[in-house]
Amino acid sequence: MEIIVKDLIKLWGKPVNQEKIDLQSPLGFVSTDSRTIKKGNFFIPLVGNKFDGHDFLDKVFSIGIQGAIVSEKFNGLVPSGLPHWVV
């Protein structure tokens, strides 16, 4: 089953910074590990006892990720232009 970005909008509503997102684009590979992210992937930052994946949003954005999920508890800055959903 192919999931497109538009399907995510049905689940979570419109993303923040949606101007650069193709709604008909298939969802790329989903990763929680910033060390393995490639262009076109979708990033879900995990929060652990020793790290916070949100700290790597700038890094994965510079690689060219398709979008990300961001915790509503995250107090830092999300890169300008990064399509993301706050959950």
What label would you give each PLM region?
Residues 1-87:
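N-terminal leader/targeting and accessory segments in enzymes
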